Amino acid sequence: MQKIIHVDMDCFYAAVEMRDFPELRGKPIAVGGRSDRRGVISTCNYEARQFGVRSAMASGYALKLCPDLILVPGRMQVYKEVSSQIRAVFERYTYLIEPLSLDEAYLDVTDSPHCKGSATLIAEAIRADILAETGLTASAGIAPVKFLAKIASDLNKPNGQYVIRPDMINEFVKTLPLIKIPGVGKVTAKKLADLGLHTCSDVQAYPPAQLIERFGKFGTVLIERSKGVDKRGISPNRERKSVGVETTLAKDIHTLEQCRAVMPQLIQELGARVSRSAKDRTIHKQVVKIKFEDFKQTTIEHRSDDISVNLFYQLLEQAMERQHERGIRLLGVSVGLASNSSTTDDSDVDSSQLDLGF
């Protein structure tokens, strides 16, 4: 049985700013771009969240919700330096570390000799070390599998931790809302709700074959997660190459206008996912994916260093030139993330030639 810890810093960027600039403490602040430049919130503190401000929200809208919101420009180099300090703390307890972003990581402490092998005590020690050395608080989730550890880290925020023991899993997942499962966004949650599926117990009672037929590979993943199963191990060298969102349509659509109507929700969800899991990574391309009624698919991509709504619509128009009167059953958008060592090109490619990792 694995012992997995998911460590998540509390309001990381905002917390660093409040640490370095004490005059910001106790006030609603957000790290993000200026509203007059169509900026987006990267993160905000808890004072701002009380007004409904959230990550991936347009700065202009955030200011409408919270007129006293203080917008702070990001200092990425500082955040990276603090992240290195946090990583050094992790390495005292285990070498099996899978970073998800600058402020978040999975740790496998199954064979760690520290704290008498107790994952709970190791998590407490890690959080105490981080606080002592950086002045920042962290929350943690402890569980036998990755996705439950990630969920658990949210249950006692800020500056807390939550343990899901092996004997707790069955009861814990019964009432777990599906929206809490990593990979289930608003679009997928709506489709599941339309089937009467709201919690893991609902999925457990649903015919597996129908779920797999409707959701493909993700249907299999959903069935496993609903039972508390997650076969993934820690990947120390893991580097996410892309972040994407796609939707299988309730019925085939045929026109560009119909496709354009689907795009806003996809783009909004993509922005949220990038903010959650890749906010410290550099975007190098945008991609639109279409799957047709004959199950053949195509992708169009173009170089971009940010999420441009207009570019997504331009790529959609180009992809639709390959429709040839076929119905459209799936639409997807994604961004490619640059590796520290790789180079990219901006040529259009067909999905048969490139796995975009949707």
Swiss-Prot record:
Residues holding Mg(2+): 8, 103
GO biological process: DNA-templated DNA replication; error-prone translesion synthesis; SOS response
Residues of the UmuC domain: 4-185
Domain of life from the UniProt record: Bacteria
GO cellular component: cytosol
Catalyzed reaction equations: DNA(n) + a 2'-deoxyribonucleoside 5'-triphosphate = DNA(n+1) + diphosphate
Site (Substrate discrimination): 13
SUPFAM superfamilies linked: DNA/RNA polymerases (SSF56672), Lesion bypass DNA polymerase (Y-family), little finger domain (SSF100879)
Cofactor binding, per record: Binds 2 magnesium ions per subunit.
Subcellular location: Cytoplasm
GO molecular function: damaged DNA binding; DNA-directed DNA polymerase activity; magnesium ion binding
Keyword Nucleotidyltransferase part of the UniProt annotation: yes
Catalytic residues as annotated in Swiss-Prot or TrEMBL: 104
Recorded family membership: Belongs to the DNA polymerase type-Y family.
Subunit structure: Monomer.
Designated name of the protein: DNA polymerase IV
Underlying gene: dinB
